[in-house]
Amino acid sequence: MAFQAYHGVTGAQHQTNFNNLSAQGYRMISLSVYGDPHDGRYAAVWVQRAGPAWVAVHGVDSAGYQSFFNNWTAKGFVPVIVSATGAVNNAIFAAVFEQGIGGPWLARHGMTSGPVANANTFQHFVKTAADSKLIVRSVAIYGTASDRRYAAVWHANPRYVKWHVHPSDTGASYQTAFDAETQLPGYSLHAYRPAYVAVSDDQMYCSVFKDDVVGPWVARHGLTSSQYQTEFDAQNAAGFYPICVQGGGSGSNTRYAAIFAKQDVPSSRAWTMTGTAVPTLAALDHVMQSFMQANGVRAAQLAVAKNGVAKFSRAYTWAEPGYRVTQPSDRFLLASCSKMFLEAAVQSLYDAKKLTPATKVYPLLGFSGPADPRSNDITIQQLLDHMGGYDDTPTGSGFDPTYRMRFIAQSLGLSHPVTKLDVARYMYGKPLDFTPGTNNKYSNFGYLLAGAVVEKVTNTTFFNYVKTALLQPAGITEVEVLPTLASGRTNHQAIAEDEGMDKSPIDLASNLLVPAVYGGDGEINEVGDPNDGLAASAHALTQFIHLHAVWGNGPRAAGAARSGSTPGASTLAVSRWDGVDWACVVNTRDWPPSTSPTLDDLFDTSAPISPLSITHVLDTTPIP
């Protein structure tokens, strides 16, 4: 890529560079104005390539920028880069506008900093843009510490690239944000990248992170002019060029933030299907493709069986080049579809006369002295039926211990991550939400507690019992516990994607944020495997629900279904009345707002059936 870059030049020199470079077919991909607005300095990066018509402006005040904006947007141009420096009453602006930007867009300058609920704040417009399926293209932070201001541009986001903004960080807190954001999964197990890092004159950072792909990249911040030049030379020698350079401050106090890469235009995604094609069920492929491309989903599987015979097993990938192509045998996090394995395990222990539905769980586990005497009356079957006295929902306690494992460990004074029995001990010390057997309220914890009972009775881990007693005899191989930590994940496990972050339930001494899919959601998969933490292929689910109830305990349950949702997973398994069992697993539950087809369409099983659903295809296509 032929490029030209400079920094620290005056407005006059920038204009000279503009005249020379634009005449040679270069166009700006990065522009920054910084320092004293009466003597603003400029940094810019130009690349030599064809593109739409464009115009630029620099050194204008707020009114001048608004006039330029009004004039050129009326001619079909849209801002793509905006930068500003100075206090609100004397700020100057620099910007680049392009023609032919498709879709809706949003641009504002002079935005204040404040709560999302307050109109005219940057934070408010960030949320407004995200809710409108827009993505930030450029941002500037200017003003003063007591009167912070922002300018920004958002464009349409049809591919639903995930993005986050950190409005105002010191250098140290930006580094903390950087360390957390770049651990988030997407294209790879750790995929988010800094896409834009703006710097104010008092060296506050406004950063944008995205999960799109520009190949290898390097980011630096807090650089003096000479340090930036040294870094530039080193990266250039390694085949990188700056794709975003932003300055802040004046004279010797100037500092730069820079991002280097080998491409500035994010890679496009490609559609891939694996598994044996079934021409009569090609409509299923079309339904999955429409759903995944509309919602930015990189990986999913769909499997269909009839009377225990596999009829369709396909894996789908909508991802950038280099992403590991999803295979039909890959394991996806199951979320609550894990619960069917717990139910089958308990049923097998009923059949072996090692448990009865009336077995009281806490006495069996050796617990005594409950905070609520009713706890000792909870039976194993009540746990399976969500009648054990626990209500994780807001209508009850609103406390779901399966997602609060760090909190529980700290509350118990533990120096190690919790076990199933630790979580049970904590809940044994709390009052119930209702008398066991008198109500039906969904409870993840009830299944974790039942899993502890399975371990007690079998004297082995929950999943080892499931594997040896249920899976291996049936020849089902594509089920396992999904390791919580990214370091434990393997190539046959789909990359679970979620934007969430919080503190780790495993590293109790650390206050750093970790991705939700690596424990930041508060759950340790190895502890919550009976309720949430298993992984399997869609094919394995169809094998299992032919033999065991998809909902409840017992044999195949015709007309029943089970869904699952947790950070990094959306799943559904269905046993139909016509002998068809099907399952779909998706590697995320992060969805764009107000788009169609939605997950509700895809997973629709209730009349009226959506024509965009898997059920519609199965209802209208004979399965031999």
Where are these regions (language model features)?
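Catalytic loop of the DD-peptidase/beta-lactamase superfamily, centered on the K-T-G motif
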Residues: 262-315, 467, 505-624
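Extracytoplasmic/secreted envelope proteins and their assembly/folding machinery
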Residues: 15-18, 66-69, 122-126, 175, ...
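Short active-site loop at a secondary-structure junction
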Residues: 293-303, 322-383, 432-445, 529-532
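Terminus-proximal functional modules
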Residues: 1-274
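Soluble non-cytosolic domains of exported or imported proteins
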Residues: 8, 12, 63, 116, ...
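Sec-exported extracytoplasmic/periplasmic mature domains
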Residues: 23-26, 77, 134, 187, ...
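Residue-level structural signal for beta-strand termini and adjacent loop
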Residues: 34, 85, 142, 316-317, ...
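Short, surface-exposed loop or secondary-structure junction motifs
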Residues: 371-572
